[in-house]
Amino acid sequence: MTVRLPDSLLVLERGWLSANNILFFDGDDATLVDSGYVTHAAQTVDLVGHALRGRRLARLINTHSHSDHIGGNAALQAKFGCEIVVPAGLHASVAEWDENALLLSPLGQQAARFQHDSLIGAGDRLAMGGLEWQALAVPGHDMEALAYYNP
């Protein structure tokens, strides 16, 4: 069985042990899910900029706070002026930039500090790529992690 992704969704495959980035297109705007490592931030900005093809990166949504998912946030926000949305349980950790709570310092990881604009929680719904998605709590790998499900 072959699965075909919608044309409004583009997966930017990254290297081993790095989070893939997923772009959702909605007319002239786009949403990116996760941003990769801080050490790959310049490459991420270039890849996203090329993939946008003139669209505006309006929003960046993080699934959780590991460094391979939030590392490029600051660079993308600086370049594109996008809104950053984080899981609701990360509000204080990101706002105060608590590197222990974000699991950066304990794991010897890095991420450039960024400011988030809004929160998303389990059960919330959002539109991406012309489809409706529901945020699902998926604690385990990260206790605040969210996955997005298209019912």
Predicted regions, residues:
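Structural motif
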Residues: D29-T31, R59, L131
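Core dinuclear metal-dependent hydrolase active-site scaffold
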Residues: L23, G123-N150
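Short beta-strand-initiation
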Residues: L17-A19, Q115, G121, M143-A145
